Amino acid sequence: MLRFSVADHIFELAMGAMCRPVPCPRNFRPFVTTEEGEPLFRVRLDAEVEARADEPLQTFDYELQMGDCTLAIYADEYRLTIRSAGEATIVCPFVERGETAEYRTNLFAEGKQPNSVMFDHALCFAYSFAALPHKTLLIHSSVIEKDGRGVMCLGESGTGKSTHTQLWLDHIEGTTRLNDDGPVVRVLESGEVRVYGSPWSGKGAVYRAEWRPIAGFLRLSQAPENRIQKLGRIGAFGALLPSTLPTLQKEERTLDQICGALSEMIVSVPAYALACLPDAAAAHLSYTTIFGV
């Protein structure tokens, strides 16, 4: 068994076969923990997953960069099937807040060795599903940090999120990346909103078990000139929602939890829309606006 901590939520991975070690890919190693306490969820990695006789309430098909998935939604659980050089299903039951969720997957059943796409996506989904009731969301973005605070660059795929944070790195002194694809945002009981590094960072491969308070959300779009404006709460909500996990927006319970968490985030953190060119001036414009310098 191995224990991990992401955004201060602990989870465990285990094998039923004692002779098989629990995998710990490079992107998960910074998040290994010896911290005690009841975990948010556990995943049995080599479990048997039998097909259900009843039909799901709804299904949702989507593609990955190296495969495809089917999400089946039932009244008592989600089942995500991932196909990429093989096929595996992870089963995530609904549990009451405060209970440890017991998940199971056949990723490693019968001696199988799944590729990194299957392993990462299964664990990303399991974590997102379990953390959602705790006002914790994985938000598709690239995060730059400056002076101890993070800026989350949001936008559609191909908009230039990583390009914009790279411009900060190149032209604004004292900046570093916290994550380049899948950071985790959590609303604490105090109302503070933090962004955390995670094992899911895309091609940028930035795996840091650290957190920062958020200075601002920045929704990017491409334009022939650089313009920035601060968004009201409705605009801020609309800027963030598309960057949350689409698989958790398909059912009323999880969508309500997403909307509740986002509503608290935009009360505490300002959001901006940046229409921009991929140039140094755009980076300086967003930096000076958000940090007020």
Please annotate each region the language model reported.
Residues 1-152, 156-157, 167-176, 184-293:
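A noncatalytic interaction/capping subdomain that flanks phosphate/NTP-handling catalytic cores
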